[in-house]
Regions:
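Short Gly/Thr/Asp-enriched flexible loops that form oxyanion-binding sites at enzyme active sites
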Residues: 1, 40-49, 119-122, 173-193, ...
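N-terminal small/polar loop signature for handling phosphorylated ligands or for N-terminal nucleophile
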Residues: 1-41, 123-181
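Proline/glycine-rich low-complexity loops and linkers
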Residues: 9, 15, 60-92, 96-98, ...
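Buried hydrophobic positions in well-ordered alpha/beta secondary-structure cores of metabolic enzymes
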Residues: 17, 30, 36, 94, ...
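Gly/Ser/Thr-rich loops at beta-strand to alpha-helix junctions
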Residues: 37-38, 113-119, 175-176, 218-220, ...
């Protein structure tokens, strides 16, 4: 314990660590998790005493200290004890943000991804009143995020249709994000969740300046629909830290990512997949309509494709903008698509991948330019070539 008193929460969601760090007045919080990545890619998420993730420069400094085995000057003594009971405190914090019993009558399938959501998702949804069916419901560190959860919706989509459920929810490994599936088996991503939840808050005056914080990945259809209803959008780079920083700067109450990270300042300082899932279930139940109908009336989602190109050289991956042939290819794509399309290329923050996103009104144009740009990136920056996202 290095001179500190350590509370071990056991298996729990990342947002539970952050929330309890703040509400239990702890000096900090640590979460060991692969997040949404493959099981071998475990890492550490570090939270300050206010529940915020450490700023990137502090994370990098800590990482360098660990690599160099810098002595930390720890004191002797300290203690460690299990506090699994605190997970119930976190659960009650979530339920206090909901209207009791609103989930009643809804049949919901939860894909718990063999991960952290197995610790409390069933309890939460049952207390909320939903009839729950579970996929991948036991913790298994060898299978977490493998062909299941928010990064692989196929099994959930089939289960929702086969079992006649109203909706399905898929979490990632540490439950800080979620995606949904409607009763027809169609996926509902973070853009639609953010639009629908934002609409609810807007109607009851809970959205200052009618502003939502989005990332570069947000769909063109979402952007145009929100602005047509008089809303304001604040764009950030990909990453929940960037989203929350913009929310702090602008006073926005809600922000999120297409991947299913949604942040609500009334509840939390990071994305919370369980809160997002419960809020989506509540707004669907209160509407008296299907999630499919709500999504269908929200906005036309432009065809969008994300292709991952494996680039093992980190310098080449980070310096892709310096490649003139790749820049010329992007310019040609943007000229061909005009204002109804765009290209976004960025290096992954967690994997040796260059992510190539193409979006346009016509799906055929998306497929064509995705293939051409991903192949060009692989040829110019390194092999092997493109992988489907």
């Amino acid at each position: 314990a290095a001179g500190r008193e350590v509370w071990d929460l056991g298996l729990c969601p990342t947002p539970a660590v952050a929330w309890l760090t703040r509400h239990q007045q702890a000096a900090g919080g640590l979460m060991i998790s692969a997040s949404h990545n493959p099981p071998a890619d475990n890492g550490i998420k570090v939270f300050a005493k206010d529940g915020y993730k450490l700023p990137l420069h502090q994370q990098k400094d800590l990482e360098q200290r660990l690599k160099r085995s810098v002595p930390l000057g720890c004191r002797a003594g300290g203690s460690s004890r299990q506090r699994h009971d605190l997970l119930k405190v976190y659960e009650q914090g979530l339920l206090l943000q909901l209207e009791p019993g609103q989930g009643r009558r809804l049949r919901v399938i939860l894909d718990l991804c063999w991960g952290a959501a197995t610790s409390c998702a069933v309890s939460l949804f049952e207390q909320f009143g939903a009839a729950v069916t579970i996929l991948h419901g036991q913790p298994d560190g060898h299978r977490i995020n493998v062909g299941c959860g928010s990064t692989a919706l196929d099994l959930l989509q089939q289960a929702v249709v086969d079992q006649g459920a109203e909706l399905g929810i898929a979490f990632d490994g540490d439950a800080d994000r979620c995606l949904a599936v409607d009763h027809r088996g169609q996926p509902v991503n973070g853009d639609h969740i953010l639009y629908l939840w934002g609409g609810v808050l807007d109607r009851r005056g809970g959205l200052p300046d009618r502003c939502l914080v989005i990332t570069q990945m947000a769909n063109l259809g979402f952007r145009r629909a929100w602005m047509e209803r008089g809303g304001v959008l604040e764009e950030t780079p990909v990453g929940d830290q960037h989203v929350y920083a913009a929310m702090e700067r602008t006073g926005a109450a809600l922000g999120g990512e297409q991947s299913g990270h949604v942040l609500w300042s009334q509840h939390h300082s990071i994305g919370d997949g369980l809160m997002t899932a419960l809020q989506l279930t509540q707004l669907t139940a209160k509407s008296g309509r299907s999630l499919a109908a709500l999504v269908g009336e929200s906005f036309y989602s432009y065809p969008q494709k994300l292709t991952n190109v494996r680039i093992t050289d980190p310098q080449a991956r980070e310096a892709w903008r310096c490649n003139s042939r790749l820049r010329d290819g992007i310019a040609a794509a943007e000229a061909a698509m005009g204002r109804d399309g765009r290209v976004l290329i960025r290096a992954s923050g967690t994997e040796p991948l260059l992510r190539v996103m193409v979006e346009a009104r016509e799906a055929s144009m998306v497929e064509d330019w995705s293939r051409r740009l991903a192949t060009l990136a692989a040829d110019e920056l390194g092999r092997p070539g493109p992988q489907p996202s």
